[in-house]
From Swiss-Prot:
One of its GO terms (cellular component) is ribosome. Located on the platform of the 30S subunit, it bridges several disparate RNA helices of the 16S rRNA. Forms part of the Shine-Dalgarno cleft in the 70S ribosome. This is Small ribosomal subunit protein uS11. Pfam families: Ribosomal_S11 (PF00411). The lineage of its organism: Bacteria, Pseudomonadati, Bacteroidota, Bacteroidia, Bacteroidales. InterPro entries: Ribosomal_uS11, Ribosomal_uS11_bac-type, Ribosomal_uS11_CS, Ribosomal_uS11_sf. One of its GO terms (molecular function) is structural constituent of ribosome. Belongs to the universal ribosomal protein uS11 family. Part of the 30S ribosomal subunit. Interacts with proteins S7 and S18. Binds to IF-3. It comes from the Bacteria. One of its GO terms (biological process) is translation. It comes from Porphyromonas gingivalis (strain ATCC BAA-308 / W83). Keywords: Ribonucleoprotein, Ribosomal protein, RNA-binding, rRNA-binding. Signal peptide: none annotated.
Amino acid sequence: MAKKAVAKKKVVRVEAVGQAHIHSSFNNIIISLANSEGQVISWSSAGKMGFRSSKKNTPYAAQMAAQDCAKVAYDMGLRKVTVYVKGPGNGRESAIRTIHGAGIEVMEIIDVTPMPHNGCRPPKKRRV
């Protein structure tokens, strides 16, 4: 029986400066780290980290997702990011703090939340 060839893990290097996109909705948070052209290096979400239902939109879930995403990108060589934050949900600040704590320097934070100029009617308020 022939020996199986063991494939080396491919090490991909990226440039040191990139972008971090944090999409925070009322139900989930999605974090993507990309290079300067916008090609995604690593991504994570609260659902990917194992949180379910209402636990996905907590600051702790955002922290865990950001930690997972930032570790992979840091190992690939990403060191500085411009953060683009979109959405009204919880965990926006905790995700930014976690990315900074993982060794990736945050150069600037830009809020790109889409605001309607009196477009669609919003959903009715909940009565709990």
